[in-house]
Curated annotation (Swiss-Prot):
This is Glycogen synthase 1. It holds the Pfam family Glyco_transf_5. It comes from Synechococcus sp. (strain JA-2-3B'a(2-13)). InterPro entries: Glyco_trans_1, GS/SS, Starch_synth_cat_dom. ADP-alpha-D-glucose binds at residue 15. Belongs to the glycosyltransferase 1 family. Bacterial/plant glycogen synthase subfamily. One of its GO terms (molecular function) is alpha-1,4-glucan glucosyltransferase (UDP-glucose donor) activity. GO terms for biological process: glycogen biosynthetic process. It catalyses: [(1->4)-alpha-D-glucosyl](n) + ADP-alpha-D-glucose = [(1->4)-alpha-D-glucosyl](n+1) + ADP + H(+). The keyword ATP-binding does not apply.
């Protein structure tokens, strides 16, 4: 099968969040399974050119229709860790992708509307006819609209589109100028409730809604999140649209890259280990304490790794620090704040707890240190308010670090409470789950994890081993996406 991924990110060359990891991980898994995969990406000035091998201009004269004229583009070709990627660079006064950033510009809607148009124009002019076009998030939500409304009539009528939504919070909006620019000229037709018109603002077009309505299949990043966005508040206004298209909507759990996140081969940790040599985890725990100047005592280490913001349940992260100390545990935090007020709050906590031998707060992100924390900690907390999939808990399980999570989104699909999960046998349970957003709920789960570490170390070790036995690689998601591709090809 010939598959083209159209996305605004692909790790490690373009990475602002988890989207880049998913695009790369899925592409690699599909290639391992014997399929031809190519990626089409914007050529940002800030992307990591050192991660591209053999970059060269492959198509010098791509003219993309835009408003009443056309914008001249160059298309560069190169290999990103074995994946064949095409990077589109427009030559215009707008400098769409020479902004010193990936996102955050006032005209992001125009930037990515143009990218969607340019990606399809490139496929058309280069005579590429993939079986499947897989696009991601609002930035490429117009791809299926443009494909089936314009490019279908220029020889691209046999392609099928799978559209994956990673974050419903950011949907992409625009006015009629988007239609004029891209050639979708029938304004009353597209400003219709069943097409692109936003469900809240009748004067706005919604890119993500367009992707849902016009694509052949829609996925999000976990089965439980697929239910949340239809019937809860997490669809951010698109719940009814998703429900209407539920026959082509499914949650597919993301995977993690076990070539990177695997204690058996991890190059960032001093002592490698497996479930059979779990005693070596203690050596990494000592190395973590030595590096962070924690006192070397017989206590569990509780950790948090991730952003410090409301989505991640920052108030519960803060509470977990002091609750861990109260329960005679140590706490390690590695995170960066997205808001100035939260950053100042945790900077104050770092200063206040600076002389406490049982706490270390590291503000910012350090990939090497994150590996050591996963390998050295006993428990990891993921108290998210909103978590479409979540990778932290999957990595923790692989490293034998018991997750304590809030039962939301993909956390429900991956962590099963040791004491109370009614759907799993005791030998299939792998962590602790709480559901409410108050500190008492967090305590109900965190206390049980710490108490088990102290009172029943053999049972705690068994819980670690059970967690390490789960396979959250790209193996199963890759298989599921291939089933979706086959389904829409033969509809």
């Amino acid at each position: 099968m010939y598959i083209v991924q159209i996305a605004s990110e692909c790790a490690p060359v373009i990475k602002a969040g988890g989207l880049g990891d998913v695009v790369y991980g899925l592409s690699r898994e599909l290639e391992v399974r014997g399929h031809c995969v190519e990626l089409v990406l914007p050529k940002y000035d800030t992307m990591r050119y050192d991660q591209i091998w053999g970059l060269h201009d492959a198509y010098r004269d791509l003219w993309v229709p835009w408003y009443g004229g056309a914008i001249h583009c160059s298309v560069y070709c190169g290999w990103v860790h074995g994946r064949l990627c095409f990077f589109i660079e427009p030559h215009s006064g707008d400098n769409f992708f020479n902004r010193g950033c990936y996102y955050g510009c006032p005209d992001d809607n125009m930037r990515f509307a143009f990218f969607s148009k340019a990606a399809l124009e490139f496929l058309l002019q280069s005579n590429k006819r993939p079986d499947i076009i897989h696009c991601h998030d609002w930035q490429t939500g117009l791809v299926p609209v443009l494909l089936f409304e314009i490019y279908k009539y220029h020889g691209m009528g046999n392609q099928r589109v799978c559209y994956t939504i990673h974050n419903f919070k950011h949907q992409g909006f625009g006015g009629p100028e988007i239609l004029w620019a891209t050639g979708l000229n029938r304004e009353p037709y597209y400003f219709h409730y069943d097409r692109l018109r936003d469900n809240f603002n009748p004067f706005s077009l919604n890119f993500m809604k367009g992707g849902i309505v016009f694509s052949n299949f829609v996925t999000t990043v976990s089965p439980n999140h697929a239910l949340e966005v239809q019937f809860g508040d997490y669809g951010y206004g698109l719940g009814h649209t998703l429900y209407l298209h539920r026959h082509k909507f499914r949650g597919v759990l993301n995977g993690i890259d076990y070539d990177i996140w695997n204690p058996e081969i991890d190059r960032f940790i001093p002592v490698r280990y497996t479930a059979q040599t779990l005693e070596n985890k203690a050596k990494n725990k000592k190395a973590l304490r030595d590096r962070l100047l924690l006192q070397d005592v017989d206590k569990p280490i509780v950790a948090y790794i991730g952003r410090l913001d409301e989505q991640k349940g920052v108030h519960l992260v803060h509470h977990a620090i002091y609750r861990s100390l109260f329960k005679n545990a140590q706490f390690v935090l590695l995170g960066s704040a997205t808001e100035r007020g939260i950053g100042a709050w945790f900077a104050h906590e770092k200063s206040y707890l600076n002389n406490n031998p049982d706490v270390h707060i590291e503000l910012g992100f350090n990939e090497e240190l994150s590996h050591l924390i996963y390998a050295g900690a006993d428990i990891i907390v993921v108290p998210s308010h909103y978590e479409p999939c979540g990778l932290t808990q999957m990595i923790g399980l692989k490293y034998g670090t018991v997750p304590v999570v809030r039962g939301v989104g993909g956390l429900v699909d991956t962590v099963f409470d040791r004491d109370y999960d009614p759907h799993k046998l005791p030998e299939q349970r792998n962590g602790y789950v709480f559901y409410h957003t108050d500190p008492a709920a967090l305590e109900s789960a965190l206390d049980r994890a710490i108490d088990l570490w102290y009172t029943a170390p053999d049972q705690f070790r068994q819980l670690q081993i059970q967690g390490m036995s789960y396979d959250y690689s790209w193996n199963y998601p890759g298989k599921e996406y291939l089933e979706i591709y086959d389904f829409i090809r033969h509809r």
